[in-house]
Amino acid sequence: MSGVNNTSANDLSTTESNSNSVANAPSVKTEHNDSKNSLNLDATEPPIDLPQKPLSAYTTVAILCLMIAFGGFIFGWDTGTISGFVNLSDFIRRFGQKNDKGTYYLSKVRMGLIVSIFNIGCAIGGIVLSKVGDIYGRRIGLITVTAIYVVGILIQITSINKWYQYFIGRIISGLGVGGIAVLSPMLISEVAPKQIRGTLVQLYQLMCTMGIFLGYCTNYGTKNYHNATQWRVGLGLCFAWTTFMVSGMMFVPESPRYLIEVGKDEEAKRSLSKSNKVSVDDPALLAEYDTIKAGIELEKLAGNASWSELLSTKTKVFQRVLMGVMIQSLQQLTGDNYFFYYGTTIFKSVGLKDSFQTSIIIGVVNFFSSFIAVYTIERFGRRTCLLWGAASMLCCFAVFASVGVTKLWPQGSSHQDITSQGAGNCMIVFTMFFIFSFATTWAGGCYVIVSETFPLRVKSRGMAIATAANWMWGFLISFFTPFITGAINFYYGYVFLGCLVFAYFYVFFFVPETKGLTLEEVNTMWLEGVPAWKSASWVPPERRTADYDADAIDHDDRPIYKRFFSS
C-alpha cells in the first residue's frame, strides 16, 4: 500500500519551499489552500538532494543507533528474567508464602503484583522522566534514567526475604525503563537518516527480543542452583548492561533538533553530518538544517509547550496523541503476552515438561523474527506491516482458540487431560506463527510510528502518553490473565481475536504511512489532514509537480466500502 511518491527518500526541503509549506502555518485552515497553490507555482526550482549512498555507507550510523537501541535490551532482559524468577525455588522460598503442607508458593495476587507492577513504574517514568531529555538533551536523559534503573536493581538484589522490598525495587527500575522506552526511540528517530530511519528505530525492538531471549537462557543456566544464585546472577548482570549503555552514550551524536532548539547550531550541523555521512558544508545538509531550524523557530513563536497543548485539534496534536495511544494499546491487545503465558501449558501437551525450555523456544522465534522486521518496516512501510500483521495474527488466534476449545480441552478447564496430541501440535505451530507475525510487524512498528508522529515541541509528552498506554495495558493483561484463563481457558483467545479485527480497521482508517518522509514532512502531512488510506500517495509540498492534485489526496468523497478496497 506504500506509494512510489512517498518513498523518494533522498529529497530534502529547501529553505525557500519550506517557507511556503503548511508546516509553517500557525492556522492550517486559513493558509492550507494558499500554501498548496503557491507551492505548485514554486515547484520549478527542484529541491536539493542528499547524495545517494549505498547502505554500507551508513554502517557507522547503524552502530551508533544500535548503542542507543541497547536500552531495549535492558527492558527485554528484565522481561525475560522475571518470567523465570517467579518459578525458581529459592525465589519462591524467599518471597512466597507457606501453605498448609509447609511448602512455599507464590499466590496469584503476589505473583501478579511482582511481575506487573513494573509496568506501572514504566508508565510513570515515561511521563515524568522523559522531560529530562527536553531539558538536558536526549543523551543525558538516557544516562539519567539508566541510573534510576540501577537504583531499582540494587534494591531488588539486596532483598533477603521481604517481598515488598523486591516489589519497591521493581517499581523504581520500572521508572527507569519507562524513561528509556521513550527517549531511546526518540533519539534514534531524530539522528537517523530518513532513508533508513524505520530500520534503525526497529533496532530498539530487536534489542528487546535479544534481551528476552538471553534472559531466558540465563534462567535456564542457573535453575539448578539451590540458593540466591538462581536469581541474583540475572540481576547482577544488569550492572554490566547498564555500564555498556552509559558508555555507549559517550559516542552517539546528540539530536540535531534538540541542539538547534537550545541554540547550539554548529553542533547540530556536526550531528547531521555524522548521521548522513556528508561534510558539514554540504548544500543538502545545510538545506535540511535550515528546514529543521525554520520549523523549530516557528514552534518557539507559539511559546513554551504545555500538557494542555496535547488536546489541541487546530494543529492536529490531539489526533496524533489519540492515534499513538490507540496503536500502543492495540499492540498489547494483540495478545502476545497471552501466548507467552499459555505457551508452557500448550507445550506440555507434546511432552515438553520443562517450562524453561518452553521459554527458550519462544524466545528464539521471537528474536530471529525481529531481524526480518528490520528489513520489512522500511521495505513495505509502517502501515502495510501493521495491516498484514493484524490479519495474520487474527488467523492464528482463530485456529489456536478453536482447536483448544473443541479438540484439546473439549470439556473445559475442569478436565485438562489432553485428548488429542495432534491438537496440541497444531496449537504449537500456530503459536510460532503468531509470534513470528507479531515480531515482524506490531512489535516494533508501533514504536517507529509513534517516534515519527509528533512535532518537536510536544514530542516527549506525546510519546510518553502513548507509551504509558502500552504499559498500563501491559499491567492489566499480565495481572489479570492468570485469573481469566483459569475461568474461561482458551475462549480468552476470542477476546484478542476481536481486538485484532478492530486493530485492522483502525489502522486502515486512522494510521498514515510515514515511510520515506522527514519528521518535518510527517508534520506537514498531518496538518494537511491527509486521509490515512491515501497517505502513501501523498507528496511533500516542495516535491510536488504541476500535475499533482492535492485536493484529490486531501478529500475523498467515495463510499467507505470503496475506500477500504483501494490502495
Swiss-Prot record:
InterPro entries linked to this entry: MFS_dom, MFS_sugar_transport-like, MFS_Sugar_Transporters, MFS_trans_sf, Sugar/inositol_transpt, Sugar_transporter_CS
Domain of life, per lineage: Eukaryota
Entry keyword annotation includes Transmembrane: yes
Biased amino acid composition, Polar residues: 1-16
Composition bias type Low complexity, residue spans: 17-28
The entry's keywords: Glycoprotein, Membrane, Repeat, Sugar transport, Transmembrane, Transmembrane helix, Transport
Annotated region (Disordered), positions in chain: 1-45
Record's bilayer topology term: Multi-pass membrane protein
Molecular function as annotated in GO: carbohydrate:proton symporter activity; D-glucose transmembrane transporter activity; fructose transmembrane transporter activity; galactose transmembrane transporter activity; mannose transmembrane transporter activity
GO cellular component: cell periphery; fungal-type vacuole; plasma membrane
CDD domains for the chain: MFS_HXT
Topology Extracellular: residue spans: 78-112, 161-170, 219-232, 354-359, 406-429, 489
Signal peptide range in chain numbering: none
Cytoplasmic side: 1-56, 134-139, 192-197, 254-336, 378-384, 451-467, 511-567
Residue positions with a glycan: 87, 227
Localization, UniProt: Membrane
Pfam name, any one: Sugar_tr
Family note: Belongs to the major facilitator superfamily. Sugar transporter (TC 2.A.1.1) family.
NCBIfam families registered for this protein in UniProt: SP (TIGR00879)
Known role: Probable glucose transporter.
PANTHER family registered for this protein in UniProt: GALACTOSE TRANSPORTER-RELATED, PLASTIDIC GLUCOSE TRANSPORTER 4
Name under which the protein is recorded: Hexose transporter HXT9
Originating organism: Saccharomyces cerevisiae (strain ATCC 204508 / S288c) (Baker's yeast)
